[in-house]
């Protein structure tokens, strides 16, 4: 899900692309993280390379208003770690993000799990995520989203460094991880089944096979 951002000209001092948002604009979507019923999933903010569709590195990010300034510590997942705070919404500071100068990066708002998946992952472990992801997508979509939001049928798992590998199902089947991504429907695993991952995930997103490409 893409939003809009103000793109400022690349600065010869920072050698980066700079994006600017108002905090209140981001808070409108992120406040869904505080609602009950989303115990295992959240909304995350990322930047995605418009050409390669891979995550952009965030070189620096901060918010400021008048004499107040706070820089964010960017995690390995490349997520923008914004705090969710009503007082900040009222103060409405500006949020700045620097990404590499040689890439055009689009603002990306996603529904994802709060914790990575790793090792052996069971059908029963994944099943409770489906309604939570569905609910969060519909909350983001607004009042009538339930009419048009595709059904979440599994998970899209993303791995670091554009990993090429495979996941192994407990029934002996395998599925390729290509450029760090693999999509798995819950029905492919089956009740009582498991999948084995080669390394921990970086992001786990909904799998929406009925969504328009």
Describe the role of every protein-language-model region:
Residues 10-11:
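N-terminal signal peptide c-region/cleavage motif recognized by signal peptidases
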Residues 82-101, 184-200:
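Noncatalytic modules at the cell exterior or secretory-pathway interfaces
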Residues 71-77, 108-110, 170, 177:
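Short amphipathic beta-strand/extended segments with alternating polar/hydrophobic composition
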Residues 91-149:
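Surface-exposed beta-loop interaction hotspot
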Residues 14-90:
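N-terminal Sec/ER secretory leader and immediately downstream segment
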């Amino acid at each position: 899900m893409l939003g809009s951002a103000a793109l400022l000209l690349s600065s010869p001092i920072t050698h980066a692309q700079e994006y600017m948002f108002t905090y209140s604009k981001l808070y409108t979507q992120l406040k869904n993280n505080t609602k009950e019923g989303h115990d295992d999933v959240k909304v995350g903010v990322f930047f995605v390379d418009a050409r390669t569709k891979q995550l952009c590195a965030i070189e620096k990010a901060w918010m400021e208003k008048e004499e107040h300034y706070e820089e964010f510590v960017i995690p390995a997942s490349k997520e923008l770690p914004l705090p969710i705070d009503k007082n900040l919404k009222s103060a409405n500071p500006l949020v700045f993000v620097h990404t590499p100068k040689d890439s055009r990066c689009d603002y990306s708002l996603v529904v994802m799990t709060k914790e990575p998946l790793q090792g052996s992952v069971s059908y029963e472990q994944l099943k409770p995520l489906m309604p939570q992801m569905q609910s969060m997508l519909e909350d983001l979509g607004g009042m009538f989203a339930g009419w048009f939001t595709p059904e979440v049928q599994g998970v899209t798992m993303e791995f670091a460094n554009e990993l090429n590998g495979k996941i192994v199902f407990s029934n002996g089947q395998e599925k390729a991880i290509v450029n760090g991504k693999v999509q798995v429907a819950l029905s492919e695993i089956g009740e009582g089944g498991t999948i084995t991952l080669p390394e921990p995930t970086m992001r786990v997103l909904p799998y929406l096979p009925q969504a328009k490409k």
